């Protein structure tokens, strides 16, 4: 789908003080949604256990790792957990499981002793006593040594380990091999001129920290109603906008499963109505994607399905308005994008450690759990991926802008203070 063209008109003064309308044409781009993988048409999870997901993942990733370890350690034999022999070096492939002392358990909520020992609810569940286990269909073995750090890995990762069984029955890890970045389609940077994609996250319309004026400044900048002719020329180069989740915040206490009074129903719908007004202004001139987030009125489990169209009576009138899944995948002028609203990274932050969010994102690529193939992380085979972490707009007033010509990024910062 091609983004709609928009004209900006403003008066230009000549020496004879005659007003002349100057037109600025918004640039076009070619958009294609690739959300079919995440679009659930029918119920598919009924009666399934999590173990089936792990076994399916292990089967897929093990086949891949078997083909790669022959180049990694060609002279070291590959065996299963059950086939380990004490002191004999080998390679085992399996799913990591992380034993965590502070990890919450649903049974703790119903424990008889819970009143005597309060539940621990930290933001991070790391503990010095945490350890890793590797599991395949034949069994599981505790991992030892200093090569494999429990603080880096989480449950669910599939890796190949070089090591040997100790007298205590543990597996002493000597080296670790991860799948690495997936084979990449040839990056096609078709654009020879500057075209920009704007990413916004955590607008949180309706929250106590949301600043309507700050959001309106963003909308006015995108639509070309802010600034002089130079600013409007920059706005005309914006060809796509992505709202990456948590666009609204419903007042707490209203969604408790009870029948709502008419006054409460109005409070419940006000944030969505306000968001629709702003999105309508943007969709009138540029293509817009809106993804659901953890605070939005959508299903909770991933993949989250698109928000209901009935929530946006104004925006849905434009064919430039796209309701998307989370994760969301699309192509724009030959560049492929894959992103989430952040739940996967938030979970990694609870159960492991890293310098920043970008390092967590890089790990998902190396583990191939969520591996985009769009173009600065460099793989061993020359793969190039641009990682973008978008801050919460209602707290920072910052949006992220990507140039389709060279994949360079910069930020847009909006500030607004109310006078007392």
Give residue ranges: language-model regions.
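Extended recognition/assembly regions associated with phosphoester-bond processing machinery
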Residues: 1-420
């Amino acid at each position: 789908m091609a983004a709609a063209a928009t004209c900006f008109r403003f008066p230009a003064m000549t020496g004879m003080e005659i007003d002349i309308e100057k037109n600025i044409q918004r640039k076009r781009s070619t958009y294609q949604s690739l959300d079919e993988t995440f679009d659930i048409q029918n119920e598919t999870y009924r009666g399934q256990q999590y173990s089936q997901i792990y076994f399916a993942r292990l089967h897929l990733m093990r086949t891949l790792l078997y083909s790669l370890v022959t180049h990694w350690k060609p002279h070291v034999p590959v065996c299963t957990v059950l086939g380990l022999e004490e002191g004999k070096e080998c390679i085992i492939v399996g799913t990591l499981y992380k034993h965590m002392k502070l990890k919450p358990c649903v049974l703790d909520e119903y424990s008889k002793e819970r009143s005597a020992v309060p539940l621990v609810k930290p933001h991070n569940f790391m503990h010095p006593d945490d350890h890793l286990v590797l599991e395949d269909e034949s069994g599981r073995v505790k991992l030892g040594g200093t090569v494999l750090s429990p603080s880096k890995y989480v449950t669910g990762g599939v890796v190949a380990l070089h090591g040997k069984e100790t007298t205590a029955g543990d597996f002493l890890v000597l080296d670790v091999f991860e799948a690495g970045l997936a084979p990449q389609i040839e990056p096609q940077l078709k654009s020879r001129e500057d075209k920009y994609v704007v990413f916004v996250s955590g607008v949180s319309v309706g929250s106590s920290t949301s600043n309507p004026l700050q959001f309106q400044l963003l909308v006015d900048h995108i639509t070309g109603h802010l600034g002089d002719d130079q600013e409007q020329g920059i706005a005309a180069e914006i060809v796509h906008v992505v709202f990456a989740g948590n666009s609204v915040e419903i007042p707490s206490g209203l969604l408790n499963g009870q029948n709502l009074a008419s006054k409460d129903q109005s409070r419940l719908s006000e944030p969505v109505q306000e968001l629709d007004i702003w999105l309508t202004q943007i969709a009138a001139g540029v293509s817009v994607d809106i993804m659901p987030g953890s605070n939005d009125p959508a299903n909770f489990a991933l993949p989250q399905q698109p928000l209901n169209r009935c929530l946006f009576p104004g925006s849905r009138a434009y064919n430039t308005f796209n309701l998307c899944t989370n994760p969301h995948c699309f192509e724009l002028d030959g560049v492929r994008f894959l992103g989430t609203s952040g739940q996967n990274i938030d979970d990694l932050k609870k159960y492991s450690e890293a310098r920043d969010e970008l390092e967590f994102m890089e790990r998902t690529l190396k583990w191939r759990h969520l591996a985009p193939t769009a173009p600065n992380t460099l793989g061993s085979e020359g793969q190039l991926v641009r990682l973008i972490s978008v801050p919460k707009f209602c707290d920072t007033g910052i949006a992220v802008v990507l140039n389709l010509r060279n994949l360079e990024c910069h930020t847009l910062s909006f500030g607004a203070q109310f006078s007392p």
